[in-house]
Amino acid sequence: MSLSPEQQSRVFALSHDLARQGGTTELEEFLDHGVPVDLVDEDGNSLLMLAAYHSHAETVAMLIARGADVDLRNGRDQSPVAGALFKGADDVVEMLKGAGADLDAGTPSARQAAAMFGRPL
């Protein structure tokens, strides 16, 4: 069964909402049915960026396990690891570092954000 452009747009919007809300199980089902793991919204935010920024470690782990690009920056050149660091999601930062996230990518980079906010990296 194929989706109309309108239906696909709604599924993609729901996918971003699930990443933002930490709906890991539901998002995983969407991925199982063909939603791209590196899907981005109109602002360039990937599913991983939204999950990381909103401190949803379980969702971040699932997306990493499914091959999400840990360095995919949004339209403002922000990386998922810098977003997680900004929000104080230390567990997510460690997870992204463990997955090989580039700490010097983006503006500001995770290193720059850590220095600005006095957080260890």
Predicted features along the sequence, with ranges:
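TPR-adjacent "capping" and linker segments in tetratricopeptide-repeat scaffold/adaptor proteins
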Residues: M1-S9
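Alpha-helical segment of the N-proximal tetratricopeptide repeat
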Residues: R10-E29
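Conserved ankyrin/ankyrin-like repeat signature
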Residues: E26, E58-T59, D91-V92, P120-L121
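Ankyrin repeat domain, specifically the short helix-to-loop turn at the C-terminus of the second helix
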Residues: E28-P36, A61-D69, E94-D102
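Ankyrin repeat boundary signal
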Residues: L39-V40, V70-R73, L103-G106
